[in-house]
Amino acid sequence: MLAYIIRRMLILIPTLIGVSLIVFTMLHLTPGDPAELLLGERATDEALHQVREHLGLNEPLYVQYGMFVKRLMKGDLGETIRTRQKVWTEIKQRFPATMELSLVALMISCVMGIILGIISATKQYSIFDYLSMLGALIGVSMPIFWLGLVFMLIFSLNLGWLPISGRLSTDVDLSIVTNFYILDAILTGNWAAFKDAVWHIIMPAITLSTIPTAIVARMTRSAMLEVLRQDYIKTAKAKGLSRFKVVFKHALRNAMIPVITTIGLQFGVLLCGAILTETIFAWPGMGKWMYDAVMQRDYMVIQGGTLFISTLFILINLVVDLLYAVINPRISVQ
């Protein structure tokens, strides 16, 4: 197990080098001048030259990339062009908001997707099965930005049930402990802030969870149907075990292996897909931060944010692989 983890961590190094090289190359091939965006169109040539010199933009591309890698080896992701703050500092400030949104969306996806998949598998070809799989197909095909706008129109503007944007109302005070607002409200016993934070996260979390819920439901149904056809399930039924024990004790545990793979991948997708959701709902997380960076050609933010999310995605996949042995002891890590 330990040797496997070490090998996977070593693979992380060339993967991140490849990601950084691709992102660096693509950013420098796109039109636009970060110095001009920073100073404005009326900036003098001398001022532009000074900014380019300070940012190292006058150097050849291979020199700029070498400077970036050298800083990266020291744990320095550089400074943002817009605010002049350290990229790592900005990530630490904004990542909890994205993580909180992604975790809530993942919880919704897991609960709803697995329940729908189990019921559809145990009631194959029933009306519920057809309707749930039709809903899953629609969910997979649904554009997130369109769904988010529809939710805002219905539940915020027309009905006034849910707040339209942000993480917390301006008139609600909350003592920050972890920067996860829901958790902070629980830790400090601030139930007014807890209610407000939950109220704010409902719409963006449901919007973000739509596609993963549909994918998890389809995968759970497919895996359950395959397991329910196995001989040991028929034997369990012949022994007189209750339907509940057959489904949840014997079938579900073996069906969860591909489902966990799907959930792990979807968690990574949620972190990336949060860009659209955060932009629509003005959620102050990494997604909106990176979107603004793309619009303003802030190289350091895009590179640092992409590397951070890529590292997280790889680590999530490693955790998913290790969970296989926990769920099914017959599987050994090779």
Task: Locate each region found by the language model.
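Hydrophobic alpha-helical transmembrane segments of membrane transport/permease proteins
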Residues: 15-66, 155-193
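Alpha-helical transmembrane segments of integral membrane proteins
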Residues: 2-3, 95-96, 100-128, 144, ...
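Hydrophobic alpha-helical segments of integral membrane proteins
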Residues: 9, 51, 61-77, 87, ...
